[in-house]
Regions:
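Membrane-helix interface segments in multi-pass membrane proteins
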Residues: 23-53, 66
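Hydrophobic membrane-targeting signal helices
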Residues: 28-30, 48, 60, 64, ...
Length: 119
């Protein structure tokens, strides 16, 4: 079965959002640490969360864009974590998370993932 356009769109959106999350997290980290004269290093665990999410998104996007996908089904947890990106001021991540949930619940996308051979 040929990969639906929505699956391709999802994989590209996740890749772009992952790259943006890594850049956003790094920029936020640098701004807080330098803006507080290194006192912001205490906030490091919280500031690194967007970067960690970005790395997971990049890996998931690469696995989803491959043919055949190395993903058994779309990750609902990843979409929820993307929507939680609004806590760090990342509106793009919120939009991508909502689009991911809507597209992954589409009948065509569900049918495509169900038709994939189980490894």
């Amino acid at each position: 079965m040929e990969k639906p356009g929505k699956v391709q769109t999802l994989s590209i959106l996740i890749l772009i959002n992952g790259i943006l999350n890594v850049l956003w997290g790094g920029g936020l980290f640098i701004a807080v640490v330098l803006g507080t004269f290194f006192v912001g290093l205490l906030c490091t665990p919280v500031l690194l969360l967007p970067m960690a999410l970005g790395v997971v998104e990049i890996i998931h996007g690469i696995n989803l864009i491959s043919d055949p996908p190395k993903v058994a089904k779309p990750s609902r947890a990843l979409a929820i974590f993307e929507m939680c990106g609004i806590l760090f001021g990342n509106l793009i991540s919120l939009v991508v998370g909502v689009i991911y949930l809507v597209f992954s619940n589409d009948g065509e996308v569900k049918g495509y993932f169900e038709s994939l051979p189980i490894e």
